[in-house]
């Protein structure tokens, strides 16, 4: 699964808007949009935040 698909899957599973997920991760709404559209691969630090957030919510 591509990173963009993982972001959208996690967001939908948690019933979050793009804005709400952005707030949870400390990134901008535009960043979440780019990630989901597969326009940009996030930096390692941002990927780590995303995966840690998912793990804390029970999403693997």
Feature names for model-found ranges:
Residues 8, 33-34, 51:
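Key DNA-contacting residues within the recognition helix of helix-turn-helix
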